[in-house]
Structure formats: structure tokens, C-alpha cells
């Protein structure tokens, strides 16, 4: 699969399934925006993806807040100039 020039926003990507999806998409060339309630978790995953040659950013986001969601989308588009894939993985 080739996801070059595609950008994905993955909620709940600081651990578990969301982290796995983010890592897989990055390995196929996608820019990934890791979104989660705990910034330190998504930052750690983003840093590792970047160190492995991928392109990732981390954003703290509460998916129960429209403002927080909008800020995450705006930050993703600002960084990567697009948003092509949305993975809704966040859970309580």
C-alpha cells in the first residue's frame, strides 16, 4: 500500500489499536496526526515515528469538545496542507 502524500488524523493514538494504526499508516508513507487526551503519550509515539523516518505530529484533544476537535483539524491541515483520512478510535 502507498499512502504517500496522504494525511491521517487518528484519535486515541497514544496507545493500543490507535497507536498501531498510526504506525502502520506512517510505515506506508502517510503523514500522521496523533490525537489523544494525554499529550505525553501521543508525543512519545509521534517522536518515535519521526525518528524512524516518518512524519508525525502530536495534539492533545478531547473528542467531547467541538472546539478541541476543530483545533486538531486546523493544526493538521496547517502542518500537512491536507487531511485525507480520519480514524475515529477514541474511547472512554
Please give the residue ranges for each predicted region.
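Conserved glycine-rich cofactor-binding loop
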Residues: 7, 12-16
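Structural signature of the Rossmann-like NAD(P)-dependent dehydrogenase/reductase core
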Residues: 10-11, 88-91
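Aromatic pocket-lining residues of Rossmann-like dinucleotide-binding sites
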Residues: 25
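Conserved glycine-rich Rossmann-like NAD(P)H-binding loop of the short-chain dehydrogenase/reductase
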Residues: 28-44
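The beta1-alpha1 cofactor-binding region of Rossmann-like NAD(H)/NADP(H)-dependent oxidoreductases
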Residues: 40, 61-72
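A glycine-rich helix->loop->beta "capping" turn
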Residues: 52-55, 75-88
